[in-house]
């Protein structure tokens, strides 16, 4: 039982470190991206699929 606890603790610790490193890398990438054109492109990529899904869903509801 003690070995299992040590293994789980080690996995938790390594996962936490990995998550922290990924977050730092993502923050550094966001800081490097200071150009407004890139930000606008990212917003468009997020926004248009959502609008498309909503319109498709509404057309399906109205068609029935």
Curated annotation (Swiss-Prot):
The keyword Kinase does not apply. Residues 1-22 form the signal peptide. Its main location: secreted. Keywords: Amidation, Amphibian defense peptide, Antibiotic, Antimicrobial, Cleavage on pair of basic residues, Fungicide, Immunity, Innate immunity, Secreted, Signal. Residues 23-47 form a propeptide. Belongs to the frog skin active peptide (FSAP) family. Temporin subfamily. GO terms for cellular component: extracellular region. Expressed by the skin glands. Antimicrobial peptide with activity against Gram-positive and Gram-negative bacteria and against fungi. Has been tested against S.aureus (MIC=1.25 ug/mL), B.pumilus (MIC=5.0 ug/mL), B.cereus (MIC=15.0 ug/mL), E.coli (MIC=1.25 ug/mL), B.dysenteriae (MIC=5.0 ug/mL), A.cacoaceticus (MIC=15.0 ug/mL), P.aeruginosa (MIC=5.0 ug/mL) and C.albicans (MIC=1.25 ug/mL). Also shows a weak hemolytic activity. It comes from the Eukaryota. The modification Leucine amide is found at residue 62. This is Temporin-ALe. GO terms for biological process: defense response to bacterium; defense response to fungus; innate immune response; killing of cells of another organism. InterPro entries: Frog_antimicrobial_propeptide. It is found in: Secreted.
């Amino acid at each position: 039982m003690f070995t299992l606890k040590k293994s789980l603790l080690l996995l938790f610790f390594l996962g936490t470190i990995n998550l922290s490193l990924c977050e730092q890398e993502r923050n550094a990438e966001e800081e490097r991206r200071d150009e407004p054109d890139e930000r606008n492109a990212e917003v468009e990529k997020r926004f248009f699929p959502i609008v498309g899904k909503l319109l498709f869903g509404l057309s399906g509801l109205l068609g029935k």
